[in-house]
Amino acid sequence: MQNWRDETLKDNVSVDKSFDFAVRIVNLCKFLNNEKKEYILSKQLLRSGTSIGANVSEAQRAQSKADFSSKMAIALKEANETYYWLKLLHKTDYLNESQYNSINADVNDLIGLLTAICKTTNSNK
């Protein structure tokens, strides 16, 4: 049985992409913990990487345009922070080139999408 909320958010690119990205982040953090025995940076990555989708999802039920804009801006900040942690994990050899390139492409895609949403929202004020 599908939830009314799922039906309302159907075909929302930002919701879908940020959720799928959060799943990738959770799986990456499991890998970093289990295979690389890395716990500190991965905890930061888990927090920021899953926060993107949480804020995008929250924005869908914003009480006002200002609330929507604020939540999307927070999601963008979290995406930028996630980019930082991924780059650091790559430069410190916790992520190989292939792993980094794949997930980095996804975070850059999200950053571009969220930037466009924030610009559009701010220009319509």
Predicted segments, located by residue:
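Short, C-terminally biased terminal segments at protein or domain edges
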Residues: 1-54, 58, 62-125
